[in-house]
């Protein structure tokens, strides 16, 4: 193991969309906690919001209650509503002052990477090779994002989604259980990005890992630490203490297997608090993760340049 692309600074994100009581108020509380730890961004998905407002609406409520942490709702558009979704995400980017992203969801398992790219990054292949917002397709200039386009997040775990990630993602998430697998897919994604004319250094690849930190302060339970977390039907799971999780994060990043982690707390309040005050604090103490936000936008948190307009399309998309 040891990617030929090397490694940059560590990036950390957390999901705050697990099933908890309390609605958007709890989401605000969790986002503030993540911000206290200087995490790059939080994700908000349907699991949190049902039967309440959707992920975009919840994120819009969180935006004025936070000042730095990135906000990434899961956005699933059907064929008849991509313009509405783009406008809503652009509005979130505006009200959050550049902190918005969008996790490109798919309407169903039958949707392949090409359909994802065409449907959710609708302007790509429609006359603009950069995936930029088209003024003519938006309701007004006020709904266009102020930073080119919000950060795009794609789950690239499955092979068929990796082409879309290489073409248009700013952040690719991988649900993998060992560092060698993560390293191989990261290299594949970066090679793919370079192959379509992108700078591979403008793509962040994060391992998405469910975490259960209810088992003590230090050791991971058997099969959950060391070479990797345990595989489960819901994705890779780490179960143990915050200290051992910090060691796992540091080891994988040091080896160049990943640019960072998207951590999904099994019990949001308990696990996110232990993650921020335990795992993240230890990484900060060791100089492995930042202690403050040097910038104000999500692109700055991720070390990405301004949104580019050169992404190459293919396959008639």
Model-flagged regions — what are they?
Residues 1-66, 147-150, 294-296, 313-317:
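N-terminal beta1-alpha1-beta2 module of alpha/beta enzyme domains
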Residues 2-3, 10, 81-168, 201, ...:
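Internal, glycine-rich beta/alpha segment that forms the wall or movable "lid"
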Residues 10-14, 42-44, 69-75, 98-104, ...:
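Hydrophobic faces of well-ordered beta-strands that scaffold small-molecule active sites
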Residues 14-25, 74-83, 106-108, 148-160, ...:
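Active-site mouth loops of central-metabolism enzymes
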Residues 25-48, 158, 163-177, 254-257:
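Catalytic domains of carbohydrate-active enzymes, especially glycoside hydrolases
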Residues 34, 38, 62, 92, ...:
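Conserved, mostly hydrophobic/aromatic
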Residues 41-56, 176-183, 263-274:
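Glycine-rich, proline-tolerant flexible connector loops at the mouths of alpha/beta enzymes
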Residues 110-122, 182-193, 268-289:
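C-terminal helical cap(s) of enzyme catalytic domains, especially alpha/beta-barrels
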């Amino acid at each position: 193991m040891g990617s030929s692309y090397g490694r940059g600074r560590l990036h950390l994100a957390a999901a705050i969309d697990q099933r908890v009581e309390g609605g958007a108020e709890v989401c605000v509380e969790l986002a503030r906690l993540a911000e206290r730890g200087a995490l790059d961004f939080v994700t908000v998905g349907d699991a949190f919001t049902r039967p309440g407002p959707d992920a975009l609406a919840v994120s819009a409520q969180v935006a004025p209650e936070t000042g730095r942490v990135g906000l990434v709702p899961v956005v699933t558009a059907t064929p008849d509503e991509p313009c509405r979704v783009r406008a809503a995400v652009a509005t979130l980017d505006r009200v959050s002052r550049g902190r918005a992203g969008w996790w490109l969801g798919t309407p169903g398992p039958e949707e392949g990477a090409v359909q994802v790219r065409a449907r959710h990054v609708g302007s790509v292949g429609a006359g603009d090779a950069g995936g930029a917002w088209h003024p003519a397709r938006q309701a007004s200039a006020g709904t266009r994002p102020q930073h080119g386009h919000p950060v795009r997040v794609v789950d690239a775990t499955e092979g068929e989604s990796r082409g879309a990630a290489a073409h248009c993602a700013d952040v690719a998430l991988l649900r993998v259980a060992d560092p060698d697998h993560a390293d191989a897919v990261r290299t594949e994604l970066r090679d793919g990005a370079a192959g379509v004319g992108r700078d591979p250094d403008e793509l962040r690849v994060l391992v998405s890992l469910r975490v259960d930190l209810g088992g003590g302060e230090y050791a991971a339970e058997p099969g959950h630490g060391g070479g990797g977390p345990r595989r489960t039907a819901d994705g890779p799971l780490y179960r143990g203490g915050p200290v051992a999780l910090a060691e796992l994060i540091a080891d994988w990043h040091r080896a160049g297997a990943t640019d960072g982690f998207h951590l999904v707390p099994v019990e949001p309040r308990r696990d996110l608090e232990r993650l921020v005050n335990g795992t993240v604090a230890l990484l900060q103490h060791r100089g492995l993760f930042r202690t403050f936000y040097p910038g104000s936008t999500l692109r700055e948190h991720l070390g990405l340049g301004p949104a580019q307009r050169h992404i190459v399309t293919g396959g008639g998309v």
